[in-house]
C-alpha cells in the first residue's frame, strides 16, 4: 500500500509530510495491518521489568508532542518514546529544517527540539492513558540559563507517568548540548538526577541517549560513570553531525543531524564498544539504520537488547515492524534460535 503512494509523498516537503502522517495517525486513517507474528514468543521480552511483545521501538523525534503514541502501538511497536520535550514551549530552528536524501535512505534534520513544552505534553499524556510501554525523552531549552535544572524539571514533570525517562545529551542541533559528554559535566548531571529521584521517591528507570560522534576515551569514561550511577539503559546512538563523505544526494552538506542507513555501520561499532565495557550490567537500545530483519539482527549481535527506528519508517512505511519481524524470524529459524535474546552480543570484533 505505502509503495503506491511513496513517490507522491516524497514530492512533499519532509516536515509537511511528517505533519500529515501525525494527523493521519491521530485520526486513525492508517490501514489495518496484518502481523502474523504479533504474539510470537520468538520476540517476547521485558523492558525495565515490563512484558513487551517485541524489542522494536519508535525512537524519539517522531511523536514529539505525545499526540499519537497509542496509534504507534497499533502499528506493532513494542515500545514508544516521545519527545524530545523541553520545560518551555520551543519553536526550534528556522525552516526548512528537514531534508530527505532518497538515494541514501537518510534524513538530515536541524529541528532544534521543537515541542509544546513539558506542561502541555504532560497534560496530554495524563488525559490519554498509554496502552503500551511509553518512554519520555527530555532535554533543555535552547536559551536556558540552567540546563541542568531543565533536566530536573523534566524528571519532576514526567516521573509518575512515564515507564522510563531518557536524558538527551546528544542532539547536534542544540548548541553545546553535547558538552554533557564531558566527564565532569556528565557526572554532575547524573548525580543531580539521582538526588532528584530520591526527593521524588521515584524508581523511574533512567536512560541516556549517546552521541555517535565520540572518541574511544570518551566511551570508556562514560561507561564508568554510567555503571557508577546504575543507569538503566543507554540509547546508541543519536544522529551524527558528520559521516557525509559517502552520501550521494545533493543535500548531503546541509547542516544538521544525519539519520538512517548511513549511520548503521558506525552505530553498530559503537554498540559493540559499549557492550564490552558495560558487561551486561546496563542494557543497550540500538538505533541507526534499522529498516529490515537483517539490520535489527546486526544490532542484536553487536550487543543491543532492543532497537529503535524512525527514518526506516519514512522510507518503508507503517508496516515496518511487521516486515522486520517477518524477516528476522526467517534468520533466527535458519540459525536454530528460539528467542532473539539468545544472540545478543554474540558477534564482537576481535
What label would you give each PLM region?
Residues 2-45, 109-114:
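An N-cap/entry alpha-helix motif that binds or orients negatively charged groups
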Residues 13, 58, 80, 121, ...:
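Conserved, mostly hydrophobic/aromatic
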Residues 22, 26-29, 33-38, 172-185, ...:
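Glycine/Thr-rich beta-alpha phosphate-binding loop at enzyme active sites
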Residues 51-57, 130-138, 199-212, 276-286:
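Short beta-strand/loop segments at the ligand-binding rim of alpha/beta enzyme cores
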Residues 65-72, 152, 214-228, 276-280, ...:
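Catalytic cores of alpha/beta
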Residues 78-90, 169-171, 233-242, 289, ...:
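Glycine-rich phosphate-binding active-site loops on the catalytic face of alpha/beta enzymes
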Residues 83, 88-133:
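A gly/proline- and charged-residue-enriched helix-loop-helix capping module
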Residues 89-105, 243-259, 313-337:
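C-terminal helical cap(s) of enzyme catalytic domains, especially alpha/beta-barrels
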Amino acid at each position: 500500500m505505502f509503495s503506491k503512494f511513496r513517490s507522491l509523498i516524497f514530492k512533499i516537503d519532509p516536515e509537511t509530510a511528517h505533519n500529515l502522517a501525525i494527523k493521519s495517525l491521530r485520526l486513525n486513517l492508517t490501514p489495518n495491518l496484518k502481523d502474523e507474528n504479533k504474539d510470537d514468543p520468538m520476540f517476547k521480552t521485558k523492558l525495565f521489568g515490563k512484558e513487551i511483545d517485541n524489542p522494536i521501538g519508535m525512537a524519539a523525534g517522531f511523536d514529539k508532542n505525545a499526540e499519537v503514541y497509542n496509534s504507534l502501538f497499533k502499528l506493532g511497536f513494542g515500545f514508544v518514546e516521545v519527545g524530545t520535550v523541553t520545560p518551555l514551549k520551543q519553536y526550534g530552528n528556522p525552516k526548512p529544517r528537514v531534508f530527505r536524501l532518497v538515494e541514501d535512505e537518510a534524513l538530515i534534520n536541524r529541528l532544534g527540539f521543537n515541542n509544546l513544552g513539558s506542561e502541555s505534553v504532560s497534560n496530554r499524556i495524563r488525559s490519554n492513558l498509554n496502552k503500551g510501554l511509553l518512554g519520555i525523552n527530555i532535554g533543555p531549552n535552547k536559551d536556558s540559563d540552567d540546563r541542568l535544572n531543565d533536566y530536573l524539571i523534566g524528571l519532576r514533570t514526567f516521573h509518575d507517568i512515564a515507564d522510563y525517562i531518557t536524558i538527551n545529551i546528544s542532539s547536534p542541533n542544540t548548541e553545546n548540548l553535547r558538552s554533557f559528554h564531558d566527564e565532569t559535566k556528565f557526572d554532575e548531571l547524573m548525580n543531580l538526577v539521582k538526588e532528584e529521584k530520591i526527593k521524588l521517591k521515584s524508581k523511574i528507570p533512567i536512560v541516556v541517549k549517546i552521541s555517535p560522534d565520540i572518541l574511544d576515551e570518551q566511551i570508556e569514561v562514560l561507561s564508568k560513570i554510567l555503571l557508577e550511577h546504575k543507569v538503566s539503559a543507554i540509547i546508541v546512538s543519536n544522529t551524527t553531525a558528520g559521516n557525509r563523505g559517502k552520501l550521494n544526494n545533493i543535500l548531503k552538506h546541509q547542516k544538521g543531524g544525519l539519520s538512517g542507513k548511513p549511520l548503521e555501520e558506525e552505530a553498530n561499532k559503537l554498540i559493540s564498544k559499549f557492550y564490552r565495557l558495560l558487561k551486561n550490567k546496563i542494557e543497550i537500545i540500538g538505533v541507526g539504520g534499522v529498516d529490515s530483519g537483517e539490520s535489527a539482527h546486526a544490532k542484536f549481535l553487536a550487543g543491543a537488547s532492543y532497537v529503535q527506528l524512525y527514518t526506516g519508517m519514512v522510507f518503508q512505511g507503517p508496516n515496518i515492524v511487521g516486515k522486520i519481524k517477518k524477516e528476522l524470524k526467517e534468520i533466527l529459524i535458519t540459525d536454530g534460535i528460539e528467542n532473539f535474546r539468545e544472540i545478543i552480543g554474540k558477534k564482537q570484533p576481535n
